[in-house]
Curated annotation (Swiss-Prot):
Class of this enzyme: ligase
Disulfide bonds: none
Alphabetical GO biological process terms: leucyl-tRNA aminoacylation
PROSITE patterns associated with the record: AA_TRNA_LIGASE_I
Residue span of motif 'HIGH' region: 42-52
Name of the molecule in the record: Leucine--tRNA ligase
Protein's gene: leuS
Length: 829
């Protein structure tokens, strides 16, 4: 065994051993407890970054730990390979996205293997593989049959930079989640998945996921946005129809003095047609549609609008209400129409003041003698209260009035109690090339026709010329576009939109259970064995994107009979970011640390250990070069501990726990079992790898103390061997290469991964005596040793009898003695 720790020499050796012996490949073993551990698979951007290293190191510790605990662990890896970034990068590099993607996959796979992650590579796939997305196309057809996939004209989020539509969940603060450029509203024909059919189940199950972070569940609940309220009809003054409004404040209806419509509302053009305001309204509508979405939803937005020239009727007062188009009303919420109650809604209040519209107070605070006059208001009163100036409902509390007013309007056919959701159907059409083709054709005679299952897959053509601006080449690619109608055999055109890449990531975890199955998308017996994922690990930024879509998709597949679970992920860990110099690592900030450089300098085990030790997994990790060097020094200490004493360790029998031991050895024996318990519980119960590693460091220190003072304790080596072997097994999930090498050098022939996880002895944990700190008036004055089973009264008596404590008491009366058993005693005089 070399004296010096040299990770380059040992790491490749053990990686090749693991691969040759296929130690990470698994199959279904009936009767053996399974554990499916999965980290969110990466987009093959070209190189892994430190965020990947941290994420995957966390998962690998758990996977290795559970294997050693006897679980049948599935730990797969693949590639989220479709999408705009690959297409844009390929255009820039003047190559094809497929070539760019698969070259990146090859390099990133080698990086992951260099880090020693215990993936079952036999299950690897990329979502751009035809063998994967062919089954996704089948799911689309099944959803189309059930009405869960449909096409309609809709105002959608359009990114002019990426030249494609975005789902609502992909708009962050009014900007594109990919390029951070403004998103505008554009009317287009789009394909949707009817996620709203599952809205109640999606919401209900957020209360049945105890292994998920509360923050993620709250984000999903807020995104679903369930509101109990009233749907009210406001007849148009012209008599030509009505405007439907959703409100949670029917109690304020008597104070509604005007109506606000979203610029995208379908009635706007008809309401202004032929009126003097028509051209002004249309200009306003066009400008509002081009505005940044986040600007329109901002609290500080300057409220603007235009009178349409039409009015509607307040259904309880009979008063005419002017109808405005307003920039702060959006179609995504409610019905795109807002009954404006300026006395009791701040946005309406600001709008009314600006345009000189009437303000009518109809709610007063419950503890107020009278309502304030409208002209006295400096802001809207938005709380519940008691109704005033509201006809027969005056004097009612808000909650009571909401029910009564809605019920009375329902009797007249002008209202009903209803539930409204913020969640909208998932728009999956993307006007880009690099994605899974939608299996639909259009025939002038037959209309929209699904591709027959026997004709799947619809293969994305590779012989295309990518356009410099990123627009899809498919509409101009005749061999793909032109086809025969499956119904009549006549000429037809293929759908040229591709599917949102989040469709691929909404079911990949199930495919990992049967990645090589070619008779269908999912092999039910295998999926039944492995699903659901027991532990999922990834970033919180996916809370209302990937995680919500995956939950929806699993419920759809369950109802198709393809799965037998209700939820995809039993437990979820959202790890923090890796930051440097106070900011998230990014090329633009110039603070990126390349994992390859770190591995070359320090080895994979050091990089892994630092990522695990520097911070709890749910917190951000601040990169520190000194911290990396410290991790390397620690592994070097373990190496030297064994290399310096290898012959003694090899030849010594292992301590079996029997017989009395001198105090230094008894303390080490006890420390060994305390460490086993601590590390086991920290990994199993809390994922607190940082405190587990700290406990291992303490054990190393204590082993060194015994070894360096060995002659005074007799034959130390059986107890030291017990401690060292436990140490190697405990550190192996974090630093597997060095653990394998040392384990082999100690004379073992099996891989560490195949060894059972060490068990602690309850007897060994019990010290025959414990040392207590004794304070007098809060200051350390002595230490005493008492039997481990001493009562608090016995501990107090021993402290007061101690000679050093008596010196500091010096005859003063003892006012109080505070005993913290097995830790500290404080004497107050």
């Amino acid at each position: 065994m070399d004296y010096k720790y040299a990770p380059k020499r040992i790491e490749k050796k053990w990686q090749e051993h693991w691969e040759r012996e296929k130690l990470f490949e698994v199959s279904e073993i009936p009767g053996r407890e399974k554990f499916y551990l999965l980290e969110m698979f990466p987009y093959p951007s070209g190189r892994i970054h430190m965020g990947h290293v941290r994420n995957y190191s966390i998962g690998d510790v758990v996977a290795r730990f559970l294997r050693m605990r006897g679980y049948n662990v599935l730990h797969p890896m693949g590639w989220d390979a479709f999408g705009m970034p690959a297409e844009n990068a390929a255009i820039k590099a003047k190559t094809h996205p497929a070539r760019w993607t698969y070259e990146n996959i090859a390099y990133m796979r080698s990086q992951l293997k260099q880090l020693g992650f215990s993936y079952d590579w036999s299950r690897e796939f990329a979502t751009c593989d035809v063998s994967y997305y062919r089954w996704e196309q089948l799911f689309f057809l099944k959803m189309y049959e059930k009405g869960l996939a449909y096409k309609r004209s809709a105002y959608v989020n359009w990114c002019g930079t990426c030249l494609t539509v975005l789902a609502n969940e992909q708009v962050e603060g009014g900007a594109c989640w990919r390029c951070d450029q403004p998103v505008v509203q554009k009317e287009m024909e789009q394909w949707f998945f009817k996620i709203t059919d599952y809205v109640e189940e999606l919401l209900d199950y957020t209360h049945r996921l105890p292994g998920w972070p509360e923050r993620v569940l709250t984000m999903q609940q807020n995104w679903i946005g369930k509101s109990l309220g009233s749907k009210l009809l406001f007849p148009l003054a012209s008599g030509d129809g009505s405007i439907t409004v959703f409100t949670t404040r029917a109690d304020t209806l008597f104070g509604a003095t005007f109506m606000s419509l979203a610029p995208e509302h379908p009635l706007v053009e008809g309401l202004c047609r032929g009126n003097p305001q028509e051209s002004e309204v249309l200009r306003f509508v066009q400008a509002a549609k081009q505005a940044k979405r986040n600007d329109r939803e901002a609290e500080l937005l300057e409220k603007e609008g235009v009178f349409t020239g039409s009015c509607c009727i307040n259904p309880v007062t009979g008063a005419k209400m002017p109808i405005y188009v307003a920039n702060f009303v959006v179609m995504e919420y409610g019905t795109g129409a807002v009954m404006a109650v300026p006395a009791h809604d701040q946005r309406d209040f600001e709008f009314a003041r600006k345009y000189g519209l009437p303000v009518k107070v109809v709610i007063k605070p419950a503890d107020a003698a009278a309502a304030p006059a409208a002209q006295e208001l400096s802001a809207a009163f938005e709380d519940d209260g008691v109704l005033v100036d509201s006809g027969a409902y005056s004097g009612m509390a808000s909650a009571e009035a909401r029910t009564a007013i809605t019920a009375d309007l329902a009797g007249k056919g002008l209202g009903e109690q209803t539930v409204q959701y913020r969640l909208r159907d998932w728009g999956i059409s993307r006007q880009r090339y690099w994605g899974a083709p939608i299996p639909i054709v259009y025939c002038d005679k037959c209309g929209t026709v699904p591709v027959p299952e026997k004709d799947l897959p619809v293969v994305l053509p590779t012989d295309v010329a990518l356009l410099p601006n990123g627009a899809s080449p498919l509409p101009a690619h005749a061999p793909f576009l032109n086809t025969d109608c499956p119904r009549c055999g006549g000429p037809a055109r293929r759908e040229t939109d591709t599917m949102d890449t989040f469709v691929e990531s909404s079911w990949y975890f199930a495919r990992f259970a049967c990645a090589r199955y070619d008779q269908g998308p999912l092999d039910l017996p295998k999926v039944k064995y492995w699903m659901p994922v027991d532990q999922y690990i990834g970033g919180i930024e996916h809370a209302v994107l990937h995680l919500l879509y995956s939950r929806f998709f699993v419920k759809v597949l369950r109802d198709m009979g393809a799965l037998e679970v209700d939820e995809p992920f039993r437990n979820l860990l959202t790890q923090g970011m890796v930051i440097k110099d106070g900011a998230k690592m990014s090329k633009s900030k110039g603070n990126v640390v390349d994992p390859d450089d770190m591995i070359k300098a320090y080895g994979a085990d050091t990089v892994r250990l630092f990522c695990l030790f520097a911070s709890p997994p749910e917190k951000d990790l601040e990169w520190s070069d000194q911290g990396v060097e410290g991790s390397f020094r620690f592994l070097s200490r373990i190496w030297r501990l064994v290399s310096d004493n290898l012959d003694a360790l090899r030849s010594a029998p292992r301590h079996n726990g029997g017989g009395a031991l001198p105090e230094p050895l008894e303390a080490l024996h006890r420390k060994t079992h305390q460490t086993i318990k601590k590390v086991t519980e920290d990994i199993r119960d809390r994922f607190h790898f940082n405190t587990a590693i700290a406990a291992i460091m303490e054990l190393v220190n204590q082993i060194y103390q015994v070894v360096e003072g060995g002659s005074r304790a007799g034959n130390i080596w059986p107890v030291v061997k017990e401690a060292v072997e436990a140490l190697i097994l405990l550190v192996s999930p974090m630093a597997p290469h060095i653990a394998e090498e040392i384990w082999h050098e100690l004379g073992h022939t099996r891989s560490v991964l195949l060894e059972p996880w060490p068990e602690w002895s309850g007897k060994a944990l019990q010290a025959e005596e414990v040392m207590l700190v004794v304070q007098v008036n809060g200051r350390l004055r002595s230490r005493i040793t008492v039997p481990s089973d001493a009562t608090p009264e016995q501990m107090e008596a021993a402290a007061l009898a101690d000679s050093r404590v008596q010196e500091f008491i010096a005859g003063k009366p003892v006012r109080k003695v505070v005993v913290v058993p097995k830790k500290i005693i404080n004497v107050v005089v």
